């Protein structure tokens, strides 16, 4: 997955069946990682049977390396065990080993792991932002953000991205480092994650100015990562939120790619775990039904609007879109201090995650049901939203 200030397609769609397990085939143009796979177990598999399967994989992998004396494969790398769903693992295996795994009756499907790359559409320093004013107003063109003084207090936002500059003055000590699944640098060396975090909970740029922010790094300095690493970040955020109170948590994923069943299943597991998840629709001006995790129906999928209340020309659209939010020329925090301007559905999505945190602070409940609340509060103003797409734009209900 890459973040949605422009993502290359990533996906595995059509399925072939080999001895019972689906090995999902890769679409043309997808940058797969050589000999790397994501294996997803059957629904409902017990922890005991999952442990037994992994032991079998590790034994067989070691035996194959000893017997062959050929190119070394790394074997199993990440293990996924969401509290409310997805169990599986990723790793580096040769074709024969993958075929052996596919014969197992306890395997649901296998995907090739894939890489994504994000690219900012536009960047400019120190330009006033309009997005906040639009969230707090019924009419366009305002310059004031109206909001309740609770401002998301007591809520926590998990930003699954490039990391966050937790020392930035925007966060006033409310940002913490959570986990890193991509490199050994616990910092935002790209800038995307800090911008997203600022829109959620920054004192100046944030929709929920008193919310806590947790950085979950899954993309590197170039905005690049893998589906397998992103799923690890999703699992970590789900477990941490459940330990601290899932009904007080929101998660933001300003990233994505072409359809991936594993990514969608992981997103569904976050929602099933009681966490409100906002996901970018994508920046390719196409139907988001072919994007992941945007196409997962149990989460909240966000398209980008302009200051003139029209669909941003880059924004994806379609029936899977739940709501529009400001995403064109949005000002927010940048690493090291100060601000920058970025555009994309990446920038629209944290307005919605921030609104979710804001509503939690107001006592409006939490969890995936927040998406319905946000849609009910939205105003019907988007011009030319796209085929079969909602024309609703988010609003915080301040009445202004």
Swiss-Prot record:
Leader peptide range in chain numbering: 1-20
Arranged from A to Z, the UniProt key words for this protein are:
Glycoprotein, Hydrolase, Protease, Secreted, Serine protease, Signal, Virulence, Zymogen
Give residue ranges for domain Inhibitor I9. 36-118
- Write out the transmembrane intervals: none
**Glycosylated residues, chain numbering:** 222, 252, 396
List the catalytic residues: 161 (charge relay system), 192 (charge relay system), 346 (charge relay system)
The Peptidase S8 domain covers which part of the protein?
129-400
Tell me which InterPro entries the record gives: PCSK9_ProteinaseK-like, Peptidase_S8/S53_dom, Peptidase_S8/S53_dom_sf, Peptidase_S8_His-AS, Peptidase_S8_Ser-AS, Peptidase_S8_subtilisin-like, Peptidase_S8_subtilisin-rel, S8pro/Inhibitor_I9
Q: Which domain of life is it from?
A: Eukaryota
Q: What is its EC number?
A: 3.4.21.-
Q: Where in the cell is it found?
A: Secreted
Does this entry carry the keyword Signal?
Answer: yes
Q: Which residues comprise the propeptide?
A: 21-119
Q: Which GO terms describe its cellular component?
A: extracellular region
Q: One biological-process term from Gene Ontology?
A: proteolysis
Q: Which GO terms describe its molecular function?
A: serine-type endopeptidase activity
Q: Which family does it belong to?
A: Belongs to the peptidase S8 family.
Q: State what this protein does.
A: Secreted subtilisin-like serine protease with keratinolytic activity that contributes to pathogenicity.
The protein, known as: Subtilisin-like protease 7
Q: What is the lineage of its organism?
A: Eukaryota, Fungi, Dikarya, Ascomycota, Pezizomycotina
């Amino acid at each position: 997955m890459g973040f949605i200030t422009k993502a290359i397609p990533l996906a595995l769609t059509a399925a072939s069946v080999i001895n019972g397990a689906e090995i999902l085939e890769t679409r043309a143009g997808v940058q797969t990682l050589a000999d790397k796979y994501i294996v997803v177990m059957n629904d409902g598999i017990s922890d005991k049977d999952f442990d037994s399967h992994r032991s079998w994989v590790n034994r067989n992998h070691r035996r194959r390396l000893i017997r062959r004396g050929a190119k070394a494969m790394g074997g199993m790398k990440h293990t996924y065990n969401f509290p409310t769903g997805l169990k599986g693992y990723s790793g580096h295996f040769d074709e024969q080993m993958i075929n052996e795994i596919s014969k197992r009756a306890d395997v649901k499907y296998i995907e090739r792991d894939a890489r994504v790359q994000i690219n900012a559409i536009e960047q400019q320093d120190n330009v006033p932002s309009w997005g906040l004013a639009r969230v707090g107003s019924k009419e366009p063109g305002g310059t004031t953000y109206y909001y309740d003084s609770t401002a998301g207090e007591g809520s926590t936002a998990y930003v699954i991205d490039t990391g966050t500059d937790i020392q930035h003055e925007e966060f006033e000590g409310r940002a913490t480092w959570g986990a890193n699944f991509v490199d050994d640098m616990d910092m935002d060396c790209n800038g995307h994650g800090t911008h997203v975090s600022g829109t959620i909970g920054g004192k100046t740029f944030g929709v929920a100015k008193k919310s806590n922010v947790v950085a979950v790094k899954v993309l590197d300095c170039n905005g690049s990562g893998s589906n397998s690493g992103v799923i690890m970040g999703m699992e970590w955020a789900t477990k941490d939120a459940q330990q601290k109170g899932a009904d007080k948590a929101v998660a933001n994923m300003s990233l994505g790619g072409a359809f991936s069943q594993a990514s969608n299943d992981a997103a569904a597991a976050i929602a099933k775990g009681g966490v409100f998840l906002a996901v970018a629709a994508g920046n390719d001006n196409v139907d988001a039904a072919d994007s992941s995790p945007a196409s997962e129906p149990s989460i909240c999928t966000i398209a980008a609007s302009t200051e003139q209340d029209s669909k941003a020309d880059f924004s994806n659209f379609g029936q899977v879109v739940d709501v529009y939010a400001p995403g064109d020329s949005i000002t927010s925090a940048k690493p090291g201090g100060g601000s920058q301007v970025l555009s994309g559905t990446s920038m629209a999505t944290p307005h919605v995650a921030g609104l979710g945190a804001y509503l939690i602070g107001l006592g409006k409940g939490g969890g995936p049901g927040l998406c319905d609340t946000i849609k009910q509060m939205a105003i019907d103003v988007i011009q030319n939203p796209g085929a079969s797409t909602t024309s609703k734009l988010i609003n915080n209900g301040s009445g202004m």
